[in-house]
């Protein structure tokens, strides 16, 4: 099981799929990496030679921001948005959707568990 950027890449999956276990590497980037390293996309990581593993590891380290470094970069970007007080920063701070989605209904993932608010009683409702 090759270890790349602190992640154990699974042996039993195709190389293209196995690399997606690394944070910041999706399927298109994984196939791009394997193409640069001249490793077959269908070859499983346990079948990679030591030199192929080294080439893949070197390409990821040199050309891409992944794992902890990427997480830090994303957090710093969000922190900057909060500090400058822009609309997106305020939405992050308030824990609401950032990209213009509706919030009257839906947005439960971002807002968290539903907070029940007591409704008006029958006698106090407007007539």
Curated annotation (Swiss-Prot):
- Coiled-coil annotation reads none
Q: Which GO terms describe its cellular component?
A: cytosol; small ribosomal subunit
Q: Name one GO molecular function term.
A: tRNA binding
**Basic residues composition bias: residue spans:** 105-117
Q: Is Ribonucleoprotein among the key words of this record? A: yes
* InterPro entries given in the database record: Rbsml_uS13_C, Ribosomal_uS13, Ribosomal_uS13-like_H2TH, Ribosomal_uS13_bac-type, Ribosomal_uS13_CS
Looking at the record, which segments are called Disordered? 90-127
Keywords attached to this Swiss-Prot or TrEMBL record, sorted alphabetically, are: Ribonucleoprotein, Ribosomal protein, RNA-binding, rRNA-binding, tRNA-binding
Q: Which Pfam families match?
A: Ribosomal_S13
Q: Name one GO biological process term.
A: translation
- Quaternary structure and interacting proteins, as annotated: Part of the 30S ribosomal subunit. Forms a loose heterodimer with protein S19. Forms two bridges to the 50S subunit in the 70S ribosome.
Function text = Located at the top of the head of the 30S subunit, it contacts several helices of the 16S rRNA. In the 70S ribosome it contacts the 23S rRNA (bridge B1a) and protein L5 of the 50S subunit (bridge B1b), connecting the 2 subunits; these bridges are implicated in subunit movement. Contacts the tRNAs in the A and P-sites.
Family of the protein in this entry: Belongs to the universal ribosomal protein uS13 family.
Protein's UniProt name: Small ribosomal subunit protein uS13
């Amino acid at each position: 099981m090759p270890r790349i950027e602190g992640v154990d890449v699974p042996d039993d999956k195709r190389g293209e799929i196995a690399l997606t276990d690394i944070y910041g590497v999706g399927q298109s980037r994984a196939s791009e990496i394997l193409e640069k390293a001249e490793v077959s996309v269908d070859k499983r990581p346990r079948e990679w030679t030591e030199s192929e593993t080294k080439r893949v590891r070197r390409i990821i380290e040199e050309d891409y921001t992944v794992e902890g470094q990427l997480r830090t970069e994303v957090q710093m970007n969000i922190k900057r948005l909060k500090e400058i007080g822009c609309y997106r920063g305020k939405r992050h701070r308030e824990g609401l959707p950032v990209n213009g989605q509706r919030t009257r209904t839906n947005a439960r993932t971002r807002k968290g568990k539903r907070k029940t608010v007591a409704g008006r009683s029958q006698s106090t409702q407007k007539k």
